Amino acid sequence: MAPAVSLAVLALVALLAPGLGVALPGCDYPAHLWCSSWEIAVACQVESHCANLLRPAAPPVELTLFYESLCPACRWFLVQQLFTTWLLLPAEALSITLVPYGNAEERNVSGKWQFQCQHGPEECLGNMIETCLMHEAKNFSSYFPVIFCLESGSSVTKNLEACLQVYAPQLDSGRIAACVQGDTGAALMHHNAQLTQALDPPHQYVPWVVINGKHTDELQEQAQASLLGLICRLYQGEKPEACGASGAPKAPFHCRH
């Protein structure tokens, strides 16, 4: 028995090729296959009539934030823009990578990496805590609320236990501390240094925002003015409901070298 053809497709055949049953120009498929896949529907220009097909999922917008834990501008952007945007958008619309290092410098002393940070040793410790937290938690949705808690609180370096209790009680603070104090943390921070040093163009300040592998002054300004609006414009899939919201005020400064 021949495959069933939808009434919509039959109507299209009647309208577009009356009496012939031939395909549209550029479409090499018979009418009964026009709604068999999204690719064929697009080729035959009938996708709006193939209600049974789902549009292929658009890739998420890829955002990488290069920052440092005690930079006021970084904290503002992470708390006021990035975290709120992440809460509002579904995972399929936005994928985030965090790289805490920023304007730090590193040197290898007798085979061990040492770090000097723009806002002093406390910032190096904060960078290391957040890096080890990410390493131990693995899952972004587990560690990002903890980082938000640290960055929005009174002390990035002293509130880990409290933030874990609220946002990720399943994580072991002892393992995070061991990472911070051991070779693993230094190796992870060295990797962050390599990622930061490999930026093209080189970063001039933090927060430094890379969108889909690209950084421009225009993207940076748009991200700091309204990150939600920027992601909504760039996302090629069906727009989430939150994309009707307005943006937050623009961050007034950076932390430069």
Give, region by region, the residue ranges found by the protein language model.
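Intrinsically disordered, low-complexity regulatory regions enriched in Ser/Pro/Gly/Thr
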Residues: L54-P59, L88-E92, L199-H203, Q224
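C-terminal cap of thioredoxin/glutaredoxin-like
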Residues: A2-L7, F66, G153-H257
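Disulfide-rich extracellular modules and peptides
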Residues: Y29, S37, V46, N52, ...
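N-terminal signal peptide
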Residues: A2-V5, L12-S37
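Structural alpha/beta surface segment adjacent to cysteine/selenocysteine redox centers
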Residues: P59-S173, E238, A245-H254
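A short beta-strand-turn-helix
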Residues: Q45-V61
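Catalytic cores of eukaryotic secretory-pathway lumenal/extracellular enzymes that build
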Residues: L10-A11, E105
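Extracellular secreted precursors and ectodomains with disulfide-bonded cysteine-rich loops/domains
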Residues: P25, L33, V42, S48, ...
